């Protein structure tokens, strides 16, 4: 029996908040080997350049667990939705590069947690918009959807 449950969980305090604060992109393959201790990445052997995108509101990360008893398989399908307000040429060019690439993605939430999306396979942009909005209060900016399918959920990161 290699799949034994090892612990439970009590109801935590109501101190968490939703949302993503910052998203970082690094070129695929630049992480090198990750050191994973107790389900947490504590370091990488590579020297990736991380490119920071600050986001506010309407950005989220969700991981669906897909498991098949018939096939004996389980994988994790993570979807990262990001919204960037305001349009400018430099951002549009970077988003074009990201859309053509398969980056590793680090996500910082508003609870101070960092997650690594696409450790093994990278992430793929599978949608997005460049929008001007119609009314004065509408979004003018960019939306981007990044998807990563992995054999493990996004790892917590300590460094």
Where are these regions (language model features)?
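Solvent-exposed edge beta-strands and adjacent loop segments
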Residues: 9-81, 122-136
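Residue-level signal for secondary-structure boundary sites
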Residues: 90, 113-115, 152-154
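Mixed-charge, glycine-accented linear interaction segment located at domain edges/termini
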Residues: 120-159
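Short, acidic/charged, Gly/Pro-enriched secondary-structure junctions
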Residues: 93-117
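A general structural signal for short secondary-structure junctions and capping/turn motifs
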Residues: 72, 95-97, 106-107, 134-138
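Short, conserved charged micro-motifs
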Residues: 89-96, 155-157
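Oligomerization/assembly interface segments of phage tail-like spikes and tubes
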Residues: 68-89, 138-152
